[in-house]
A protein has these predicted regions:
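Bacterial Sec-dependent N-terminal signal peptides
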Residues: 1-29
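Membrane-proximal, proline-rich intrinsically disordered regions
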Residues: 20-64
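Proline-centered turn/helix-capping motifs that create local helix->coil transitions or kinks
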Residues: 21, 58-59, 73-76, 147-156
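Short clusters of hydrophobic/aromatic residues that line enzyme substrate/ligand-binding pockets
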Residues: 23, 31, 36-37, 69, ...
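Short, surface-exposed recognition loops and adjoining beta-strand edges that mediate ligand/DNA contacts
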Residues: 34, 60-79, 158
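Conserved, well-structured interaction surfaces
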Residues: 44-48, 52-53, 79-151, 165-170
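Hydrophobic, small-residue-rich alpha-helical packing segments that form membrane-like cores
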Residues: 160-161, 171
Length: 171
């Protein structure tokens, strides 16, 4: 009985110790938006990453679908009846992908812009900071231009977001 009591007490002690907060560890190697754009290398990689988002717009043929989708170039393709018949709506996968890709890239631009405007990044001189800010603003404007061309009045978030925004003022 004494052995059973010792085992029971030991098990309960271990169970109670597992809920202590001193066992929680901070992941120092995890990259987040909060710590990614705090160094010169991080902000440089962030700006370079903005250019890789343009690949989706041009290589994945979003602009071809948006500009030439209803023309006779796409007649032979199956699954493009909405384009051919001019009955494209928000349920179209190409339209949704274009919208999502553009706003995902706008959010990345906003994160870089906010970091450049609000953080004093060690090792980043004023000329490089100005260049990175100009590149980020231009790429964001590029996406807004294509969104406005395709959809008209659109929401234009100018701050990075982590969740769905249901109410954004139009500019």
């Amino acid at each position: 009985m004494k052995i059973l009591n010792k085992i029971l007490i030991g098990s309960l002690s271990l169970l109670c110790l597992s809920s202590c907060d001193f066992l929680d560890e901070t992941a120092y190697n995890k990259v987040t938006v909060g710590n990614f754009y705090t160094t010169k290398d991080g902000i440089t990689n962030g700006v370079n990453g903005l250019y890789s988002t343009l690949r989706g717009m041009y290589i994945q043929e979003y602009l071809i679908y948006m500009c030439e989708g209803p023309s006779d170039i796409w007649i032979g393709h199956q699954g493009h009846e909405q384009w051919y018949n001019w009955t494209i709506d928000a349920t179209n996968a190409d339209v949704r992908s274009f919208w999502y890709s553009c706003y995902k890239s706008v959010n990345q631009c906003n994160a870089v812009i906010e970091s450049l405007e609000n953080n004093d990044i060690p090792g980043l001189d004023e000329d490089l900071k100005t260049r990175f800010l100009a590149e980020s603003l231009f790429i964001r404007a590029h996406y807004f231009y294509h969104l406005v061309q395709q959809f008209g009045d659109i929401p234009m978030p100018l701050k990075p977001t982590n969740s769905v925004l249901l109410h954004i003022k139009q500019k």
